[in-house]
Amino acid sequence: MTATSDNFFNAYAIFLGASLGQMGWVTGLPQLFGSLAQLLSVWLASHFSRRQFIVVCAALQAGVVLGMGALAAFRPDNAVWLFIGLAVLYQGFINLIQPHWRAWMGMIVPQRRRGAFFASRTRLTMMASLSVFFVGGGILTLTDSIQMAWLGFSLLFSIAAMGRFASAWLLLQMHDPEPRAAKVSGVFTQTLYNFRQAWKDKTFRHYSLFVAGMQCMVAISAPFFAVYMLEDLHFTYFEFVLSSVASIFTQFITLRFWGRFSDLYGNRLVMMITSCLIPSLPLLWLFSDNYLYILAIQAFSGLAWSGFTLSTANYLYDIRPFRSDFATYAALQAALSAGFVFIGAMLGGVIASYAEAFLIWTGLNAWLTNPIFLVFMISTIMRSLVALWFIPRSVEPKARPRPELLTLIFRIRGFNAISGVSLDWLTVAKKKRAKNKEQDKE
């Protein structure tokens, strides 16, 4: 479902006639509400049957996607704002489900097989998503060529909805070994207390502000790459898809390289390298509109974002105090980032709305031929400032004693407009000790 919905959100908003200011809302508001929903989900966990809650949310999410497809067919006057509202609900349901699904899978999949299972699942998901992404681009290009792009979008979202309904039905058939979590009083209060305690950690505070700040500055320009490609360069939908895949595929194939590099030299060095590369990405779009050049830029961005995403995820696990609640640190960092993304996207929308008038007033329009270029330049400058602020404050985490050899299992949750591939931690699992014990018994 992700490949036929999330990846086309910006393109769909442009098709519906979203203004530059509204593009900021399309990116920022769903991210903000999604994060709030994930925090709410922690509290809801003790009040509902886990399987039923997940199935109901999945079915409602499918209904939301079906509604998105209906917008393309009927095109009401306020279609863009209706789409933004549906996107908010879509992200909300995803994030309500996520913590429950993560806990459920953690109980079903044997601990010794989690790494192999989720590695295989990630490969299968990526192949399926990219295949459907290509097919979706082909459908949109074909229908757009006969002036019926609305039909292409309606088909895509209808297919995505049917896939989600099927997913909900399959989830309903699954066994849940712990259908209802025990009710614990004061869960919300305890969560807030854990957040306050985590925020007192200086290293974690600097890290969180860095990641959130970088995503904020990226969000300034993130919604407008699709606008530039589809509206200004007049890419076909298939060309648009291919340029996006160039980044996503590069991220996927370079994750292993960055993983080995960080094992050798540390996550801090990878963060420093990639945080110096990321500011240059919007600036590169100013130099040429050649399609092959843009594919090269996208591939380069995939390399940078792959290392940044992986190293920041690993760094968070490394810097948390020993025996502390990793879920609290991850939830707080995600919530902060979502809030900053909302601010950045709103700021980007305002800048884009007034960029043309500003360029004419200053006379810079002779140099910057497209108002969106001003958004790209401001995003580059602000990303650089965030990197310059964090690098002298970053520390290499000291190795802490561990009673067991542990590994943090990540899965690729999907793709987003901010950083492409989105990683999600699943669990902390014993790496080899269990296997060694079995051999000792033999």
Regions found by a protein language model. Give the residues of each.
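Helix-loop boundary and gating motifs at the non-cytosolic
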Residues: 1-36, 41, 61, 66-67, ...
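Transmembrane alpha-helix termini and helix-breaking/packing motifs in multi-pass membrane transporters
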Residues: 11-15, 42-47, 69-74, 129-151, ...
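Structural signature of the two symmetry-related core transmembrane helices
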Residues: 52-68, 161, 269-284, 380
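Intracellular juxtamembrane helix-capping segments at the cytosolic ends
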Residues: 94-109, 307-322
